[in-house]
Each structure stands twice: as C-alpha cells, then as structure tokens.
Regions:
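Conserved catalytic cores of phosphodiester-cleaving nucleases, focusing on short active-site segments
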Residues: 101
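Basic, Lys/Arg-enriched alpha-helical interface segments
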Residues: 1-86, 95-98, 106-125
Length: 125
C-alpha cells in the first residue's frame, strides 16, 4: 500500500482561494521526474510555465476544457489535467485543495493516466 504525504506547492499562488499541494507517494513527487525530463527542452518548459499561469488564475469558471478538463473513463471523478500544447499536469481536485500528482505528454496520456490511477489508489483527505 502506498503512503501519501503532502507539501505546499510553492510554484503556484492561486488568486481564487484554491491551495495547491504536492502529492508525495512513498516520499516521491512524480511531477519532479517530469520536470527533470523536460529541463533541456525550451518549448516544453514554456508550456509548463503556461500551465503554472493557468494554476495561478484557476477557478472552475475561468478555464475552458482546452486548458483544464476532468479525466473520463476512470473510477475517480476528482482527477483532472491542466494542459498546454502537448504538455499535461495531472491533479486531484478536492475543493479548495488541488494536489499536483504528475506531468506527462499528450502522446503518453493513456499510459500516464493508468499509472496515476493505480498509484493514487487509497488517497483520500
């Protein structure tokens, strides 16, 4: 069984009352692996910065499905993705808290979602 802990996600300062956290699974923040993977790719880093801007201004009313959407076809209804171009950031939305889980690419989306769903089984706050 995975062990979950959270820490404040300091890269986001939401203007609308949402609080963003890192979701650590067994002391690992999966999102860090994605950031490491794109560190030498300026286009992907730019898209990630765009997603951080979306997170800063996030409110359910503001963002269209082209930037933020619920992940369909999984048992959990609280898994969402922020997206810009081919870059995805997967989160769990439990208002007013948003837990950043992982990042990925559109081309690997199905595989990423399956992996995330498996790894967050049992996560509740």
């Amino acid at each position: 069984m995975n062990r979950f802990t959270t820490e404040l996600f300091e890269l986001v300062n939401n203007e609308n009352g949402y609080i963003f956290y890192k979701l650590l699974i067994n002391d690992n923040f999966l999102f860090d692996y994605f950031v490491e993977r794109i560190k030498n790719s300026p286009p992907e880093r730019t898209r990630l910065k765009t997603i951080f801007a979306y997170m800063d201004m996030f409110s359910k009313v503001l963002l269209p499905k082209t930037k933020f959407r619920n992940i369909k076809g999984v048992d959990r209804k609280d898994i969402f993705e922020f997206k810009s171009g081919n870059v995805r950031v997967y989160v769990i939305l439990q208002c007013p808290h948003i837990y950043v889980v992982a990042g990925g690419f559109k081309t690997e989306q199905d595989k990423d979602i399956k992996r995330i769903v498996q790894q967050i089984k049992g996560f509740q706050l």
